From Swiss-Prot:
PANTHER family per UniProt: ALPHA-CRYSTALLIN A CHAIN, HEAT SHOCK PROTEIN HSP-12.2-RELATED
Region (Disordered) residue spans: 147-173
Protein name according to UniProt: Alpha-crystallin A chain
Localization of this protein: Cytoplasm; Nucleus
Transmembrane feature ranges: none
GO cellular component: cytoplasm; cytosol; nucleoplasm; nucleus; protein-containing complex
Modified residues (Deamidated asparagine): N101, N123
Effect of T55A: In 50% of the molecules
Chain spans, region Required for complex formation with BFSP1 and BFSP2: 1-63
The keyword Disulfide bond is annotated on this UniProt entry: yes
InterPro entries: A-crystallin/Hsp20_dom, Alpha-crystallin/HSP_16, Alpha-crystallin/sHSP_animal, Alpha-crystallin_N, HSP20-like_chaperone
Residues where N-acetylmethionine is found: M1
Gene Ontology molecular function: any one: unfolded protein binding
Gene expressing this chain: CRYAA
Amino acid sequence: MDVTIQHPWFKRALGPFYPSRLFDQFFGEGLFEYDLLPFLSSTISPYYRQSLFRTVLDSGISEVRSDRDQFLILLDVKHFSPEDLTVKVLDDFVEIHGKHNERQDDHGYISREFHRRYRLPSNVDQSALSCSLSADGMLTFCGPKVQSGMDASHSERAIPVSREEKPSSAPSS
């Protein structure tokens, strides 16, 4: 039986479990070399590993919480203004769309666009939905839940995005 022995320099850091930023929520912030060729980081040195914690922090926040009293969506949209964002409810779904036209940044010109669609729980009071954008770019979509005996109405309507002057105090989970 032949066993192939690989030098540790050619092993990929954490193998298939190594998180890739390629499809994360970056909205055009640029790619690093390790995003396209993640195995190169481990070929430099057998002891070099890209920080997993930094990768998680760099990915922005996209969190959905649903507890007994409310439904909450936290979405990092720091590159968009309230005018660039559209939030609407269609039946049992909330759709969040962000788009800004081409503008200049440090590296040239860039335009960004994203679509997110979330299913609302059936017991969310759709008449009391709210959406706000904090000063640090955190979009908060919130809806209280109704008692199980009450029925929430389902139709299409737009939810205005209000701007808050203070940064978000999004609790980490």
